[in-house]
């Protein structure tokens, strides 16, 4: 018997209405919305596997998933059918392609790219409410960028991971952590092969403390070296975080 065709999906979503990517009983999830759309499309229950298990409120412009569909579809037809059944959820399948059955959205990934958006202004948010973190106190983004380089490379990131994180090891290798300002918009760009639970938001919150003058780069280095969750700065809220792209 021939194997079911495997499809790679590229997905964007607004994370606000969801408990996160991962299925949870009686709660709306991105994975659940996609699996319901797949069931409506092919008539059978299937499992959709994501590259990144984003938390509640976190958005994606380039999440990747794979799914085995029990009957063959042309890739563009599958994309359109899933999108039709996803409405009115704020989830869109941007692309679908047939891939070998050895492809795994999570385990085949070699790099994940995240962007954290900050609005550094005193005024309330009108258009970007729920899409950025408004920080009213002026931020020294040059100091933030310099301090961020302390975290580049392979480290024990225990300080910057959630206490509920289930990763076997706290060691991760951070390839990029840049802080970029354009007017009152501050973007924190990072990429790595993988991250610990809440690692990006924990790093962002600590960098904001640097930007506000509460911490220096040495304080950030000391927090990293402490390998203790209580040494972390505040955890940035989820609404500013975006999974931008996954590389294979």
Curated annotation (Swiss-Prot):
Organism: Rhodopseudomonas palustris (strain ATCC BAA-98 / CGA009)
GO molecular function, one term: tRNA pseudouridine(38-40) synthase activity
Class of the enzyme per the UniProt entry, highest EC level: isomerase
Cysteine pairs bridged by disulfides in the record: none
Catalytic activity: uridine(38/39/40) in tRNA = pseudouridine(38/39/40) in tRNA
Pfam families assigned to the protein according to its UniProt record, in alphabetical order: PseudoU_synth_1
Chain's role: Formation of pseudouridine at positions 38, 39 and 40 in the anticodon stem and loop of transfer RNAs.
Coiled-coil portions: none
Keywords recorded for this protein, A-Z: Isomerase, tRNA processing
GO biological process, one term: tRNA pseudouridine synthesis
InterPro entries: PsdUridine_synth_cat_dom_sf (IPR020103), PsdUridine_synth_TruA (IPR001406), PsdUridine_synth_TruA_a/b_dom (IPR020097), PsdUridine_synth_TruA_C (IPR020095), TruA/RsuA/RluB/E/F_N (IPR020094)
Protein family per UniProt: Belongs to the tRNA pseudouridine synthase TruA family.
Highest taxon in the source lineage: Bacteria
PANTHER family membership: PSEUDOURIDYLATE SYNTHASE (PTHR11142), TRNA PSEUDOURIDINE SYNTHASE-LIKE 1 (PTHR11142:SF0)
Subunit field text: Homodimer.
Identification of the protein by name: tRNA pseudouridine synthase A
Keyword tRNA processing: yes
Keyword Isomerase: yes
Enzyme Commission numbers on file: 5.4.99.12
UniProt-annotated catalytic positions: 55
Residues engaged in binding substrate: 114
SUPFAM superfamilies in alphabetical order: Pseudouridine synthase (SSF55120)
């Amino acid at each position: 018997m021939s194997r079911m065709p495997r499809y790679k999906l590229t997905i964007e979503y607004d994370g606000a209405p969801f408990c996160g990517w991962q299925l949870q009983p009686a709660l709306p999830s991105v994975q659940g919305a996609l699996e319901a759309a797949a069931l409506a499309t092919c008539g059978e229950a299937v499992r959709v596997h994501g590259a990144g298990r984003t938390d509640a409120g976190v958005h994606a412009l380039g999440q990747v998933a794979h799914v085995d569909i029990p009957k063959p579809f042309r890739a563009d037809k599958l994309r359109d059918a899933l999108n039709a059944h996803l409405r009115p959820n704020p989830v869109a399948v941007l692309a679908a392609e047939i891939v070998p059955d050895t492809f795994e959205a999570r385990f085949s990934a070699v790099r994940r790219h995240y962007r954290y958006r900050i609005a550094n202004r005193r005024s309330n948010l009108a258009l970007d409410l729920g899409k950025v973190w408004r920080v009213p106190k002026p931020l020294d983004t040059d100091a933030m960028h310099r301090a961020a380089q302390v975290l580049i490379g392979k480290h024990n990131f225990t300080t910057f991971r959630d206490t509920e994180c289930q990763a076997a090891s706290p060691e991760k290798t951070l390839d990029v952590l840049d802080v970029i300002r354009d007017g009152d918009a501050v973007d924190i760009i990072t990429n790595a092969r993988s991250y610990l639970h809440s690692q990006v938001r924990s790093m962002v919150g600590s960098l904001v403390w640097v930007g506000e003058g509460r911490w220096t780069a040495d304080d950030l280095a000391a927090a990293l070296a402490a390998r203790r969750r209580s040494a972390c700065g505040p955890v940035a809220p989820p609404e500013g975080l975006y999974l931008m792209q996954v590389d294979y």
